[in-house]
């Protein structure tokens, strides 16, 4: 696959990260194969996870083709950039086409990135996963590699202002590969959830204590932070979805439409999907 824009974009991003004083704390990157197809499954805590997550494959000199929602590709600036990097557009109403494209990429030996939670976790713990990651890996016959991101939420996430002040640490932990067979997608997805959750815990444990004091808003409640509990996060997600659907219905001129109306009721402005 010919890449004209991806390498210079990476160089530009690295320069920007140096300006921001970002420190990368990485582990397990040897699990990303240097050749052949592989599916990287990331947790999702930030709007820029797909920007920073690609660095998990840099030590192996691989470029990650991320699956991202269609609306990102519709943007007049972001769309051409995403297409030039050969990322994969996902239509949440009809995911068959994007799944076929991901399978083709993987069978051609590419590395594909997916966010099986589908949307950002407000609790910063791993939410329930969609089964797409295990099904795609099984059908393509490639390893499924869990990757935990930590600290990205401090820069840009839901319900909090952006903070690009200098000197933050970004944790990236790559786990050992799984080899789904597709015989039991439910069990294989549960195993992916277990592994991804364990990697997130490792990333939290390894994170500099001075940057992560008790009571930090970016810490899960279970780790002494003030982030919403998983239960409360689900409630907030539902409230956001209902409010968004109602706004869309009103904009369409339907005052009687309920909170579940609107063709894009599941779209939350989040660039990455699973």
PLM regions: where:
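Short acidic-hydrophobic, aromatic-tinged amphipathic segments that line or gate anion-handling sites
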Residues: 26-27, 88-91, 180
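Catalytic core of membrane glycerolipid acyltransferases/transacylases, capturing the structured
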Residues: 10, 18, 33-94
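N-terminal signal-anchor transmembrane helix
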Residues: 15, 19-35
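Generic structural signal for residues in well-ordered beta-strands
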Residues: 24-26, 87, 170-172
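Non-catalytic C-terminal accessory region of glycerolipid acyltransferases
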Residues: 4-5, 96-274
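Glycine-rich, highly charged phosphate/nucleotide-binding loops
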Residues: 23-25, 93-99
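Short, structurally constrained coil/turn elements
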Residues: 18-20, 60, 108, 166
């Amino acid at each position: 696959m010919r890449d004209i824009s991806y390498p210079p974009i990476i160089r530009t991003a690295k320069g920007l990260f140096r300006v921001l004083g970002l420190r990368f704390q990485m582990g397990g990157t040897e699990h990303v194969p240097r050749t052949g197809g592989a599916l990287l499954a990331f947790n999702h805590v930030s709007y820029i996870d797909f920007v920073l997550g690609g660095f998990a494959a840099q030590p192996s000199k691989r470029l990650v083709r991320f699956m991202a929602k269609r609306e990102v590709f519709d943007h007049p600036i972001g769309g051409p950039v995403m297409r030039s990097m050969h990322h994969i557009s996902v239509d949440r109403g009809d995911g068959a086409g994007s799944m076929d494209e991901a399978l083709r990429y993987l069978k051609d030996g590419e590395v594909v990135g997916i966010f099986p939670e589908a949307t950002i976790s407000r609790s910063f713990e791993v939410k329930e996963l969609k089964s797409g990651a295990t099904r795609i890996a099984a059908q393509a016959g490639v390893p499924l590699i869990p990757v935990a991101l930590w600290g990205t939420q401090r820069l840009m996430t839901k319900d909090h202002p952006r903070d690009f002040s200098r000197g933050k640490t970004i944790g990236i932990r790559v786990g050992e590969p799984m080899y789904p067979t597709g015989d039991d997608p439910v069990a294989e997805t549960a195993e992916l959830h277990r592994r991804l959750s364990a990697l997130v815990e490792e990333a939290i444990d390894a994170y500099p204590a001075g940057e992560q004091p008790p009571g930090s808003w970016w810490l899960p409640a279970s780790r002494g932070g003030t982030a919403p509990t998983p239960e409360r996060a689900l409630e907030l997600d539902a409230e956001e979805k209902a409010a968004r659907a109602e706004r869309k219905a009103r904009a369409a001129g339907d005052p009687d439409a309920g909170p579940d109306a609107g063709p894009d009721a599941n779209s939350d402005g989040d660039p990455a999907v699973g």
